[in-house]
Amino acid sequence: MEFDTIPQEAMWQMNLRSSETMESGPYPEHPGEPDCSYYIRTGLCRFGATCRFNHPPNRKLAIATARMKGEFPERLGQPECQYYLKTGTCKFGATCRFHHPKDKAGVAGRVALNILGYPLRPNESERAYYLRTGQCKFGNTCKFHHPQPSNMVLSMRGSTVYPTVQSPTTPGQQSYAAGITNWSSSSYVPSPRWQGPSSYAPLILPQGVVSVPGWSTYGGQMGSESPQQTMRNDQTYGTSHQGELENAGLQGAYSQYRSGSVPVGFYALQRDNIFPERPDQPECQFYMKTGDCKFGAVCRFHHPRERQIPAPDCVLSPIGLPLRPGEPLCVFYSRYGICKFGPSCKFDHPMGIFTYNVASPLADTPGRRLLGSSSGTAALSLSSEGLVESGTAKPRRLSLSETRPIPPGDDNIDDEG
């Protein structure tokens, strides 16, 4: 009987004490002592008036004050807060149940930073997104490795991205600084990737198409013109200008074009090779064709530094693109004036498709002449509706893949008007 009664009384007393201590009530305030973490977290304290820690009346204000001051609880005997060791802060504040030593605040996160402000962690794996773009949204708190960007391509918006090019003039003529009137700013060719005004520096070129080593990823031969030809930009080169063409040194079968009307086929800069070299892996076919790779440093194929470019099997235009009269027209080139495949492209890249008549205003010219014929045959014009054959009785629209034979020896371009 007594044996059954004692445990029941003890249990009743324990329950009573538990209910009494868990009730909210006045708890002792010890301003010089640390705050009671259990009280701060729950508003209750099982020790009641015998607790030796501080119990501030306004718990929310105490939590906010602790976070603002950077004061975090020190709990000797408890595991150290890893987030506190890395960053020097703790989102749980005074309610965190781990140990926060003041002398180790952020000591684990004190790593060396690269020139862009990202952490260098040689023992960790490299951040793939950073290797491709040069940016990392996690900043200096990222746990991955961010190597120095010495071999990376950085987006330098608003800076001069093209090197200074010397004008192909006579030795006695002034250089770029004094002879800026002999230069022209070549506008960018419209592209679906270039929407709106560009914040990049404009491409400065002289009146002739200048060959600059390293600008293009393929070895095309680009011609330049003599000072006599620079003064005659309002004329179209034909068979009567053979003497001037010989002095200018233009090469290729379609060199009788006004150089001021020739678009630049490639906007590429000479840069360090950022693509990985993996001799034991197959070669990246896209890189071998274009010299670029969208996967960057994370590509698993081989990217040889010295790319063996096969010799072209056709005549190249002055901007280094293949001339294949019997093949369909390169659609991308016909729209934007560039071709990423360079001399390895299997389509035709005629030069006359982008020849403008600078003698008359562009507003008076509804279309652009395309490989006109002096023998009275139908000529093609490139208008807003596409390719139109305008020399016939009824103009008809042509597809970009349709080709028409060019009479032999007829490689002149007729000025419109």
Curated annotation (Swiss-Prot):
Entries under SMART domains matching the protein: ZnF_C3H1
Zinc finger (C3H1-type): 31-58, 75-103, 121-149, 278-306, 324-352
Places the protein is found: Nucleus
Highest taxon in the source lineage: Eukaryota
Keyword annotations of the record: DNA-binding, Metal-binding, Nucleus, Repeat, Zinc, Zinc-finger
Pfam families from the UniProt entry: zf-CCCH
Keyword Metal-binding: yes
Entry-linked PROSITE patterns: ZF_C3H1 (PS50103)
GO cellular component terms, A-Z: nucleus
Major localisation: nucleus
Keyword Repeat: yes
Single annotated GO MF: zinc ion binding
Spans annotated as Disordered: 383-417
Protein name, as recorded: Zinc finger CCCH domain-containing protein ZFN-like
UniProt source species: Pisum sativum (Garden pea)
